[in-house]
Curated annotation (Swiss-Prot):
Entry keywords, A to Z: Cell inner membrane, Cell membrane, Membrane, Transmembrane, Transmembrane helix, Transport
Protein name according to UniProt: p-hydroxybenzoic acid efflux pump subunit AaeA
Protein's membrane topology: Single-pass membrane protein
Organism name: Enterobacter sp. (strain 638)
Residue spans crossing the bilayer: 12-32
Gene: aaeA
GO cellular component terms given for this protein: plasma membrane
Pfam families: CusB_dom_1, HlyD_D23
Amino acid sequence: MKTLTRNISRTAITVALVILAFIAISRAWVFYTESPWTRDARFSADIVAIAPDVAGLITAVNVRDNQLVKKDQVLFTIDQPRYQKALEESEADVAYYQALTTEKRREAGRRNKLGIQAMSREEIDQSNNLLQTVLHQLAKAEATRDLAKLDLERTVIRAPSDGWVTNLNVYTGEFITRGSTAVALVKQHSFYVLAYMEETKLEGVRPGYRAEITPLGSNRVLKGTVDSIAAGVTNSSATRDSKGMATVDSNLEWVRLAQRVPVRIRLDDEQGNLWPAGTTATVVITGEKDRNASNDSLFRKIAHRLREFG
């Protein structure tokens, strides 16, 4: 009898443990596969690629790599003497054509006043046409001067906003061409998070929902709000051939990989460049309200920690 009771007890305990394990595995499966979260998230920021609008020798570099700069602070300067000479030349042309215009206007006015009684109509028309030609040349000279002035102003490269200088790869004495990127500026107060959510989890993601962000290698949890969800992603399995026909890649019907959709998350409190743009994080969407960790069960607390560091 004791042996039977012992066997029944062992069987009951085994069945109970199996049931508990099944429940735990089921809850873990739902928790990890259906709840809206991802480890594929990146800190991002607005980045300006700074390139000069003029070409020439770099005569001064006023900043260092990774320096925090203010808006309109001078970053570097390009060959000002050359552009100063070009401006002086264009100003001389303007002064010449202004004087010539005054002379031709006076001459045309005198001939028009005398009229055909003193000279032929052809001479009067010729004088008026010459005045119009000189006025046209003056306008061109003024436009050239304005462009020279603009070029001179743009020899001084300034920061378009507050931010951090990064990847500075220009040095005094180098020749830089127009439009070539010299440095990147990471705008201050522009940091956000891009979470690449699987399409199967988008049902639980809406603009305005709250989010928890855990940077990789950190136990600090940041808070944020879903700002927007991308309206589309590239279809990598469908392209066009040289004749414009659709080319669709073959796939296995029983294996379908979920597409990842970018979700932009606005941070409640920006941490400057503590987590640089491009670094990774885990993102959990908690719904309309923040998660109250004190109300979580032990299982959920453990699952959250494993998910954050997984």
